[in-house]
Structure formats: structure tokens, C-alpha cells
Design a protein with these regions (language model features):
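PP2C/PPM-type serine/threonine phosphatase catalytic domain
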Residues: 1-237
Length: 237
């Protein structure tokens, strides 16, 4: 969703019920940055490149797939920016991706888009690569004050802004009643975690959950583009 304050949606998402190469379940959210159309181009190019790499890959190892696809995507976005500096100089994107394989979720993250696990509680799996998060972790800022910090949108890592990229990786065992949320900061900056949990836990209709999350973020101001992917884990243990 474009939100209430932006004229263009610079977020891109990927989800599918079909296999992507050797991967049965792949989900991605990317939040682009850059002037004019550059943010949209960065997020879209990153997802297209990453999914292309995974689709054509022969390895089945989820961590290897995430690492190599992100390197490939970073190279594509960075070289595109260099090829057209007038339109694309400095463009980049956040990138959070999840592969779910046989009860285990493998997550990669760059920037401040997030992945949560939701059940009776809500747990943020990723760690924001942002100035505010660094201040909080260094004890220089209280977390509650961080939500309204004037520099909360400054990120410290992004995909496509240089010839190298440093993602974080996480591996999580999933339970059969878990739900997974991938989202851009247009959602997580506008809605408290507990309310996100209540909305997702309050319905089994995943499309309805996404609509309610986006509506609520817009209700609170819709200051940025809003993207959400909600996944239900429903296998027999």
C-alpha cells in the first residue's frame, strides 16, 4: 500500500504458493530508497534478481541460497545504479527474506524491514540495521523513545549501495500454530508490536490480516509505504 504521505510505492514483495527452483516456500519484502523512481527500481530489481538466482540454482541449502542470491541481487542493483547515475545514483533497498524448509525457517535481513513470529506472543526475529537501533543497543537511547526519534528512518546497511553487502542470518524452528510476518517499516513504525499480534492472531484469513494491518497503519498516519506478507504454519507435528 502506498500509505497516506507518499505518491509512489517504493516497496516490493514476493510470495508464491509454488516452488521457486529448489525452494518450496520463499517470501521477501524490500523497501527501496532513492530519488524519483529509484527506490521502486531498487526494490523491484533486488527481488527479481534474488528470485531469478534461486530459481536457477542447483544447490538446495537454504542458507547458501540466501547468501548467494543476496550477493547476486546486490550486484545487479549496484551496477544498475552505476549505469545511470542521473536517475539511480545512491539507490538501494532493505531486504528481508525467508525460506521455510521442513519446519525450519531460514531468514536473511539487511536494513530495517522486519520478520516476526506471531502466536500467543510476538517475537521480532530480525534486528534493524538503523541508527536508532544502534543507539538503543549502546544504551544511549531508551527503546520507547526510539519510536519517535527524528532520525529513526536512517538505516546503517542496505542492499545495492556498494559493491559488497553484509546481511544477518537467522535460523528458527517453527511450531504448527505459528504465523510469520514480513513487513516494511511503514507498518512496524506505525503499529505497536502487541497490536500487530492481536490483528494477526484474531483471524485465520491471511488476506484479511494483511488488510487490517495496512488499514491500521494508515489510520495511525500512513507516513510511509506499507507492505506485509503473513504466512501461516499449519503442518502436522
Amino acid at each position: 500500500d502506498v500509505g497516506k504521505k507518499r505518491s509512489m510505492n517504493q516497496d516490493s514483495i514476493f510470495y508464491t504458493d509454488e516452488a521457486v527452483g529448489p525452494v518450496q516456500n520463499l517470501y521477501i519484502v524490500a523497501d527501496g530508497m532513492g530519488g524519483h523512481k529509484a527506490g521502486d527500481v531498487a526494490s523491484r530489481t533486488a527481488i527479481e534478481a534474488a528470485t531469478e538466482y534461486i530459481r536457477e540454482s542447483e544447490t538446495r541449502n537454504p542458507v547458501t541460497l540466501l547468501k548467494r542470491s543476496i550477493i547476486y541481487a546486490n550486484d545487479k542493483v549496484y551496477k544498475l545504479a552505476l549505469s545511470d547515475p542521473d536517475d539511480y545514483a545512491g539507490m538501494g533497498t532493505t531486504f528481508v527474506a525467508a525460506i521455510i524448509d521442513d519446519g525450519t525457517m531460514y531468514v536473511a535481513n539487511i536494513g530495517d524491514s522486519r520478520l516476526y513470529i506471531v502466536n500467543s506472543e510476538i517475537k521480532q526475529i530480525t534486528m534493524d540495521h538503523s541508527l536508532v537501533e544502534e543507539l538503543i543497543r549502546n544504551g544511549q537511547l531508551d527503546r520507547n523513545k526510539g519510536r519517535n526519534h527524528p532520525e529513526k528512518n536512517i538505516i546503517t546497511r542496505a542492499l545495492g549501495i556498494g559493491d559488497g553487502v553484509v546481511p544477518d542470518f537467522f535460523e528458527v524452528e517453527l511450531a504448527s500454530d505459528d504465523k510469520v510476518l514480513l513487513c516494511s517499516d511503514g507498518l512496524s513504525n506505525m503499529i505497536e508490536d502487541d497490536e500487530i499480534r492481536d490483528i494477526i492472531s484474531g483471524t485465520d484469513d491471511l488476506n484479511e490480516a494483511c488488510r487490517k494491518l495496512i488499514d491500521r497503519a494508515n489510520y495511525y498516519g500512513g507516513k510511509d509505504n506499507i507492505s506485509a506478507v503473513v504466512v501461516a504454519i499449519d503442518w502436522e507435528e
